[in-house]
Amino acid sequence: DKPIIAKTLYVTPQNETICQTEFTSEYYLDLLDKNYPSKPLSEKKGIVYISRSKLPAINCLLGEDYLEFYFKKCGAKIVHPQEISINEQLEIYNSARCIIMLEGSAYHTFQLLGRALGDIMVIERRSHNGNFPWCQSFIEPRCNSYTFYTDYNEGGGENYLKTITQKNN
């Protein structure tokens, strides 16, 4: 609630833009890693589903309540980012072995992290007509693995969840 006075303010050149097709630079990710150190992959645990179900209906996916039910049944923690602080989001994302989400603005929080993410699975919610999913260029360099699902019938997400939950039990 009060202004912050700094003796020195460091500003890095803008390194990420909407619709970029080049991956985020290693230099920029190094700066972010210094600011928010990543937990080792071996310490990351659990599955997180970032939900849009409590947003206005125009921003949601029809049937997302079912996805939440399914992911919760598989042991996933359901997160509604608009209900928690940025710091809580960063801690949850840095600690998760796997993050599953519908594409949307919630993944901009990832841009505050360097290479702190485990496995990321993004489910398409709007058509890209075969174009490069714009989030890939800044998510992929930050995570252990990145999968962008454009077909809900692929079954990969279900198989992945079974593998993760079996390893955690």
Language model features with spans:
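The feature primarily captures lumenal catalytic ectodomains
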Residues: D1-N169
